[in-house]
A protein has these predicted regions:
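C-terminal motif of bacterial Sec signal peptides marking the signal peptidase cleavage site
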Residues: 26-29
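Extended ligand-binding regions for polar small-molecule ligands
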Residues: 31, 78-87, 146, 152-160, ...
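Extracytoplasmic small-molecule ligand-binding "clamshell" domains
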Residues: 36-117, 265
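Periplasmic-binding protein-like
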Residues: 58, 135-142, 222-260, 277-287
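Ligand-binding cleft/hinge of the Venus flytrap
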Residues: 66, 82-88, 169-191, 221-223
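Short helix-initiation/N-cap motifs at beta->coil->alpha
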Residues: 78, 93-104, 148-149, 188-200, ...
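Acidic, polar ligand-binding/catalytic clefts
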Residues: 82, 91-155
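A ligand-binding cleft/hinge motif common to bilobed small-molecule-binding domains
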Residues: 101-104, 118-125, 174-175, 203-236
Length: 287
């Protein structure tokens, strides 16, 4: 390439460097566009930095927990989040937030979305938007052999029940105390910041039962060597959702499209099957 003779010597010396920088920028942009086009999806403005930040209450197996001996986050939510990020052509970053802090973290922008076995409720719908992705219910976890004979939800009356703070299950216990367990036969509720603490209280004899997501209860039983069991009853079947900020329509649409693709190509089913959660597969039409 010939340069005009009238360019100052300094500019003539810098121009080749500038052209190299420009070429590198254009090449990187083309590479990103090619990667995005290959998936048919383009990340929304919220993900312009190339990172999808997911808020999760860790640990809460089988949805999110660290693999033994490593710092790798695994579980239904973790694996789905990685697959969604891959579909969108971005990286994923997990942010550990307790159950009560999930929505505030989303609202103030610390995370882009919540994937944390979060049930969709009317109260939460007033604050954030949801993309449904899993169905389940509340399980009742008891010691092996079920010594107290708890079989249904109203059998929890007069019993001590451990539950995690900031969860639908705590709301369910409070509702029992104003309905089936009202009038002096209330459930004695013990709250804990982590699910594992509630289970430890049950093991130590400080509680007669734990109420938690049914999938989590099944996972606790699987790891208990017979010392725990879940009763054959689910309280209030519910739907879990990916939480996004109100007004983030482009991000919601992008995640919805990405999830629909995972459902169509089988990756969604594969993830749930791998965690023994086939009963939670969401087959409704996404909207």
């Amino acid at each position: 390439m010939s340069l005009p003779a009238r360019l100052p010597p300094t500019l003539r010396a810098l121009l080749p460097v500038a052209l190299l920088v420009l070429a590198a920028v254009l090449l990187a942009a083309c590479s990103r566009d090619a990667a995005r086009d290959s998936r048919g999806l383009t990340p929304p403005p919220e993900l312009e930095d190339g990172v999808l930040r997911i808020g999760s209450d860790i640990p809460y197996p089988p949805f999110e927990s660290y693999a033994a001996g490593s710092g790798t986050l695994t579980g239904i939510d973790a694996d789905l989040a990685r697959a969604l990020a891959e579909q969108l052509g971005v990286e994923v970053q997990f942010v550990d937030i307790d159950a009560e802090g999930r929505i505030p973290a989303l609202e103030d922008g610390r995370v882009d979305a919540i994937m944390s076995a979060m049930t969709i409720t009317e109260a939460r719908r007033q604050l954030i938007d949801f993309i449904p992705y899993f169905k389940g219910g509340t399980g009742i976890l008891v010691p092996g052999g079920n010594p107290t004979g708890i079989r249904v939800d109203y059998h929890l009356c007069l019993h001590t029940v451990a539950v995690q703070e900031g969860t639908l299950q705590l709301d369910q216990l409070k509702a029992l105390n104003t309905s089936l367990c009202a009038g002096g036969v209330n459930v004695r509720i013990k709250t804990f910041t982590q699910h594992g603490q509630a289970v430890a209280e049950l093991r130590a004899g400080g509680a007669d039962a734990v109420v938690t997501d049914y999938a989590a209860a099944l996972n606790d039983v699987r790891l208990s060597d017979g010392s725990l069991e879940v009763i054959d009853f689910q309280m209030l079947p519910v739907t879990y959702g990916i939480g996004v900020r109100k007004g983030s329509g482009e991000l919601k649409a992008a995640l919805t499209d990405a999830l629909a693709t995972l459902m169509k190509d089988g990756r969604y089913d594969d993830i749930l099957y791998s965690w023994g959660a086939r009963a939670g597969i969401w087959k409704e039409v996404l909207s």
